[in-house]
Amino acid sequence: MIAVFVVQNPFVTMALKATIYKAQLQLADMDRNVYADPGMTIARHPSETDERMMVRVLALALNWPADTSEGTLELAKDMWEPDEPALWHKNFSDEILHWIEVGQPDDKRLMKACGRARKVSLYAFQSSTPVWWSGIETKLTRAHNLTVWQIPTEQSQALATLTQRTMQLQFTVQDGTAWINDGE
């Protein structure tokens, strides 16, 4: 009797491709007097969750520039390129005006971003954010151009439920509160 075993080589892996999402946003930010209808194509990295992707979309909506004469805010390739943020606003001479991170980057990454951009924003959303922040807060005292926002876990998870391959999202901001609606 002959036994045949098929063994897969654990070192051979296939590169997974990004999943493409389309989003059409309607922005009404009454606090900043910004009204826009940007459309975007989102290349979602295979390891990126719905929650993280939608926090990137939220960050884009909350930071859309009122004046696009100095360029626009764009989704960057932070999951593929270690030297890029989640989003950035670059002017036409390639200067980084606004560097936006999502999640829980380390203090070195944030300090490097503060040195490269005029303004840096971080949108943290995981339930472990308070513990993470207590570990790096004192290391960021020199980062005067850094603003950190914490999105409550329940809200970021609710935002993730709006994920669809093709999305139509309305963002309304008034008195410091953001409402997000998918029309359903």
Where are these regions (language model features)?
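Conserved catalytic cores of phosphodiester-cleaving nucleases, focusing on short active-site segments
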Residues: 87-89, 96-113
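N-terminal active-site wall of soluble small-molecule enzyme domains
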Residues: 81-91
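Extreme N-terminal leader/targeting regions
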Residues: 2, 7-49
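Short His-Asn-centered micro-motif
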Residues: 76-78, 90, 100-103, 123-126
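Domain-level recognition of nuclease-like catalytic cores that cleave nucleotide substrates
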Residues: 132-184
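Hydrophobic beta-strand segments of well-ordered beta-sheets in folded domains
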Residues: 117-124, 144-148
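Acidic-basic catalytic patches of nuclease active cores, encompassing PD-(D/E)XK
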Residues: 31-79
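Short polybasic amphipathic segments
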Residues: 23-27, 87, 177-182
